[in-house]
Amino acid sequence: VALSIISCTAATGVACAQGSAKAMPDTREKFEPKRDASKDIQNAIKKATKENKRILLDVGGEWCIWCKRLDEFFETNSDARQYLKEKYVVVKVNFSQENENKEVLSKYPKIPGYPHLFVLDKGGKLLHSQDTGLLETGDHHDHDKVMTFLKKWAG
């Protein structure tokens, strides 16, 4: 319950709230507390090496409306979704009361709010830590800001 109230983006003061972003079919990949994030990252490294892609760690949880809004952004913007698919191997890393993934996340810089994105090279080396609050405009993720971020770090 406490995590439902923590700030999504501490830097911008935007609060997380429970609930869905919009009434649309929920086909997105969810943040799963029971997943083995370390194993998922190792599998992503193998895939990224084989496909010559970067890795995008998407850290968040089902409790965070901005995490759902970021997923919705990719669902509704086919150009961004396609670019992400072509250039990145995406790994959702759960952060919730059920599983904070402390061991995995301790290897990366402190997260100021959720969702948070880490860009890794194909070997798993951290290239960039992205506060997603900087990719927002008002109550949504800004298409141009997200695309600029994706293109800058695609390699």
Roles of regions detected by a PLM:
Residues 16-35:
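N-proximal helix/coil linker or "cap" segments that precede and/or mark the start of modular domains
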Residues 35, 80-100:
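Thiol-based oxidoreductase modules, predominantly thioredoxin-like and allied folds used
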Residues 68-83:
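Typically the conserved alpha-helix immediately C-terminal to a functionally engaged Cys/Sec
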Residues 35-53:
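A short beta-strand-turn-helix
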Residues 99-112:
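Structural alpha/beta surface segment adjacent to cysteine/selenocysteine redox centers
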Residues 51-62:
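Short active-site neighborhood of thiol/selenol oxidoreductases, capturing the structured segment around
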Residues 112-155:
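Non-catalytic, surface beta->alpha helical segment in thiol-disulfide oxidoreductase systems
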Residues 1-10:
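Bacterial N-terminal signal peptides
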